[in-house]
């Protein structure tokens, strides 16, 4: 059933904007890119705690963990650069692929870029599931990383451009919801396959990633391209036809004219990456980069990558480690649903600030428990304290899932102006994957050297990012994208200085630009 409504443009003209089934279905299908990403995040920690997997690819770690060799420290038994590379190589490949994905997103469209991501995922899954040596295993992870780079570039843009303004935040968070569902699915699979003997358990875990890979590929074939992308590539008749379909009305002429004007302004920018560095675009760039760095420095991916390994380090048995990872994965999914409901009601800042307090408290409590109860050679954490650690980790994961998880992607996608949005999204994904790689590659070594202090380290970052949000992050709830300059940046106590009138008339490629697109942007109307 469609929902009716109107969206108001910057010049006061109202455009009819219905929430049509095709929009909802397209957003759901596109968001399956997050399902694949989430499965890759969740599966690595589970298989790296499986004895058969360690024995085949990482015999040194296997001897320390399973055979009982090297009793030096519980915190250090998984400290192995090769093991960390298995996890982190995906994100380094994704970082590289993002540069190519920016080009394909702009020239081939969002839909075809998602299809390319699906193909990379399928080939990578096949190599991982059939891996005979470490080189083949890493090659598969690299191809999966290429898929991540293409999917993370195209999907958030697709969702922002096709979603109606009043539910833009909720629909955009479908991507993050699918990430959390993918993590939970991977944890459940790992819990089941860990009981399979003969070396097939880890192969099944890695091979079942083919399910979300196929969903993304089929979804990319079924969804409609955004009108923004079609007009941008000169396919005007198709763009108008799609606009009618996703609107559920023939009354699209005024809106289509606005879309043409927005596309014209965007095409005048010949060097979008260079334009990102111009003074009027610095606030959006700083916010986007900072959010990606802070998102990773919460420590969430370290926990999601290595949850079973982490629980094993803390003295949990093998089954208990995998089961605890399933519990945290379920909390992750449910809490993301909270974000979908609340992000367009209470706003972005409230969610981020509340979560900062909750994450800081949880990590400090975990650090205290581990500092007192877990030594280098202790074999088991008592049941009461083990439950408390799991509860605190779940409290921490819940806070992240309704704040920094989805909003780290949503806010950059809605704050960049149209003429620099593709480049801005590319920078956003690059920074995110770079710091994801750093954390994934360093976490087990940091755990070995910092011990319980690793949680103090991440809690300090949570404090810093909360202060940043309090003073420097403006609220963007229910504000059309093309009005961000006037209603957000020019009214902010700090960022307004970058929006001075004399900067509004800088020349961009021979044309005057006021740093604000008055044309139509699909993400604010559909």
From Swiss-Prot:
Q: Which UniProt keywords apply?
A: Cell membrane, Membrane, Sugar transport, Symport, Transmembrane, Transmembrane helix, Transport
Q: Which Pfam families does the entry mention?
A: Sugar_tr (PF00083)
- One Gene Ontology cellular component: plasma membrane
Mark the transmembrane ranges: 19-39, 82-102, 112-132, 142-162, 169-189, 204-224, 297-317, 320-340, 350-370, 384-404, 427-447, 452-472
InterPro entries in UniProt: MFS_dom (IPR020846), MFS_STP/MST-like_plant (IPR044778), MFS_sugar_transport-like (IPR005828), MFS_trans_sf (IPR036259), STP/PLT_plant (IPR045262), Sugar/inositol_transpt (IPR003663), Sugar_transporter_CS (IPR005829)
Protein task: Mediates an active uptake of hexoses, probably by sugar/hydrogen symport.
In its UniProt entry, what is this protein called? Sugar transport protein 13
């Amino acid at each position: 059933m469609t929902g009716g409504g109107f969206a108001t443009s910057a010049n006061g003209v109202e455009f009819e904007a219905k929430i049509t089934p095709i929009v909802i279905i397209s957003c759901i299908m596109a968001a399956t890119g997050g399902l694949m990403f989430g499965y890759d995040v969740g599966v690595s920690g589970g298989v790296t705690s499986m004895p058969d997997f360690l024995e085949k690819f990482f015999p040194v770690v296997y001897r320390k963990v399973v055979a009982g060799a090297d009793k030096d420290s519980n915190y250090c038994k998984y400290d192995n650069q090769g093991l960390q590379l298995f996890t982190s190589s995906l994100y380094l490949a994704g970082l590289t692929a993002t540069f190519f994905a920016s080009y394909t997103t702009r020239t081939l469209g969002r839909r075809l870029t998602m299809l390319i991501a699906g193909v990379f995922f399928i080939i990578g899954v096949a190599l991982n599931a059939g891996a005979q040596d470490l080189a083949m295993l890493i090659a598969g992870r690299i191809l999966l990383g290429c898929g991540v780079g293409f999917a993370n570039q195209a999907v958030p843009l697709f969702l922002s451009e096709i979603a109606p303004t009043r539910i833009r935040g909720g629909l955009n968070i479908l991507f993050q919801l699918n990430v959390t569902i993918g993590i939970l699915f991977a944890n459940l699979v790992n819990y089941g396959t860990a009981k399979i003997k003969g070396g097939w358990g880890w192969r099944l875990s890695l091979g079942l990633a083919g399910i979300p890979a196929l969903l993304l590929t089929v979804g990319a074939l079924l969804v409609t391209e955004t009108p923004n992308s079609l007009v941008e590539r000169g396919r005007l008749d198709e763009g108008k036809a799609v606009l009618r379909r996703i609107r559920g009305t023939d009354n699209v002429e005024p809106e289509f004219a606005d879309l043409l004007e927005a596309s014209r302004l965007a095409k005048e920018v010949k060097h979008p990456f260079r334009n990102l560095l111009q003074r009027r675009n610095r606030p959006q760039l700083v916010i986007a980069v900072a959010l990606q760095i802070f998102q990773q420095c919460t420590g969430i991916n370290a926990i999601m990558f290595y949850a079973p390994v982490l629980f094993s380090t803390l003295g949990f048995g093998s089954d208990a480690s995998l089961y605890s990872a399933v519990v945290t994965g379920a909390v992750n999914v449910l809490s993301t649903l909270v974000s979908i409901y609340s992000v367009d009601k209470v706003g972005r800042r409230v969610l981020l600030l509340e979560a900062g307090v909750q994450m800081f408290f949880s990590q400090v409590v975990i650090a205290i428990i581990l500092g007192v109860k877990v030594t280098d050679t202790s074999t088991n954490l008592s049941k009461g304290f083990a439950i408390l650690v799991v509860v605190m980790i779940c409290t921490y994961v819940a806070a992240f899932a309704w704040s920094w998880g989805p909003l780290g992607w949503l806010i950059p996608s809605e704050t960049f102006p149209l003429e620099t949005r593709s480049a801005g999204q590319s920078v956003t994904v690059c920074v995110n994957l770079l710091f994801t790689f750093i954390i994934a590659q360093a976490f087990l070594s940091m755990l070995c050297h910092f011990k319980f202090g690793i949680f103090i380290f991440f809690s300090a970052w949570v404090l810093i990012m909360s202060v940043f949000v309090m003073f420097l992050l403006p609220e963007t709830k229910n504000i059309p994208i093309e009005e961000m300059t006037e209603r957000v940046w020019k009214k902010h106590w700090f960022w307004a200085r970058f929006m001075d009138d004399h900067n509004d008339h800088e020349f961009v490629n021979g044309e005057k630009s006021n740093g604000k697109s008055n044309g139509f942007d699909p993400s604010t109307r559909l």
